[in-house]
Amino acid sequence: MRNKERNFPNQNNNKFEGEPRAKAEYASKRANGTTNTHPQERMHASGKRDDNF
């Protein structure tokens, strides 16, 4: 039996509905397939976001 069927609470406050958290500005690849520049700065900025759910 899965947790969902047993009515377990959402313990980590995970968000399962709505828009995905991944944003194009933090992606490693651009829409045209080229590699995005400055990966260290991009990853640092991604970790500092306020929408942590």
UniProtKB/Swiss-Prot annotation:
<comment type="similarity">
    <text>Belongs to the SspK family.</text>
</comment>
<feature type="compositionally biased region" description="Basic and acidic residues">
    <location>
        <begin position="39"/>
        <end position="53"/>
    </location>
</feature>
<keyword id="KW-0749">Sporulation</keyword>
<dbReference type="InterPro" id="IPR012611">
    <property type="entry name" value="SASP_SspK"/>
</dbReference>
<dbReference type="GO" id="GO:0030435">
    <property type="term" value="P:sporulation resulting in formation of a cellular spore"/>
</dbReference>
<dbReference type="GO" id="GO:0030436">
    <property type="term" value="P:asexual sporulation"/>
</dbReference>
<dbReference type="Pfam" id="PF08176">
    <property type="entry name" value="SspK"/>
</dbReference>
<feature type="compositionally biased region" description="Basic and acidic residues">
    <location>
        <begin position="16"/>
        <end position="28"/>
    </location>
</feature>
<dbReference type="GO" id="GO:0042601">
    <property type="term" value="C:endospore-forming forespore"/>
</dbReference>
<protein>
    <recommendedName>
        <fullName>Small, acid-soluble spore protein K</fullName>
    </recommendedName>
</protein>
<feature type="region of interest" description="Disordered">
    <location>
        <begin position="1"/>
        <end position="53"/>
    </location>
</feature>
